[in-house]
Amino acid sequence: MSKILAKLPTEMRGELKDPLGEIYTDTDELLADAGDPLVAVGDIVTYHLLEAGHRPAAAIVDGKTERERVERKVLSAIEEFDERIDVANPQSTITDDLLEALSTALDRPDPTVVVVDGEEDLASLPAVVAAPVGASVVYGQPGEGMVLVHVTDETQAECRDIIERMQSDYSQIESILS
């Protein structure tokens, strides 16, 4: 059973509405600026990358967009990944299973999709912490587009700080991601 290692407190919800990077509406422009490996968080973002001919090294999806089920064509495209890991991760949380799956996906030589039963909305934070410097993480910004986060020491520190300020067991999170 999954153990919740971080929970987003209500008072921090507004803070996470600000994008961590530049917003793109054109997938090709995003891909031209993205580092390698590329991690995608969200079904629609992953779908757009796949439609543009790019399979991210790791994708984290939950079968929903803005809490509604995604269209069948999106699910079908995502099912094309050769490697798949299924995890449970309740809304507004980060679980040990999600972190272990993210770490495993980044270590695999083949692109891997992590399918979340629950919600993946906070997964971009540990993805930035776990990805190597020089990589990129892309996630959806509802109603605006795709946010591209370049993984640097600074963006990792920013995401680490956000996770630490959540109701979290950061030492355990760090031990899984390192």
Swiss-Prot record:
- InterPro entries (alphabetical): GTP-dep_dephospho-CoA_kin
Query: What is the protein name given in its UniProt record?
Result: GTP-dependent dephospho-CoA kinase
Q: Name one Pfam family in it.
A: DUF359
Q: What is the documented function of this protein?
A: Catalyzes the GTP-dependent phosphorylation of the 3'-hydroxyl group of dephosphocoenzyme A to form coenzyme A (CoA).
Q: Where does GTP bind?
A: D43, I44, V45, D62, K64, E120
Q: Name one GO molecular function term.
A: GTP binding
The family assignment reads: Belongs to the GTP-dependent DPCK family.
| Pathway(s) | Cofactor biosynthesis; coenzyme A biosynthesis
Q: Keyword Kinase: yes or no? A: yes
Organism of origin is Natronomonas pharaonis (strain ATCC 35678 / DSM 2160 / CIP 103997 / JCM 8858 / NBRC 14720 / NCIMB 2260 / Gabara)
Q: Which domain of life is it from?
A: Archaea
Keyword terms: Coenzyme A biosynthesis, GTP-binding, Kinase, Nucleotide-binding, Transferase
As its record notes, the protein acts as a catalyst of: 3'-dephospho-CoA + GTP = GDP + CoA + H(+)
The chain's disulfide connectivity reads none
Q: Could you say which EC number(s) this protein's record lists? A: 2.7.1.237
Q: Name one GO biological process term.
A: coenzyme A biosynthetic process
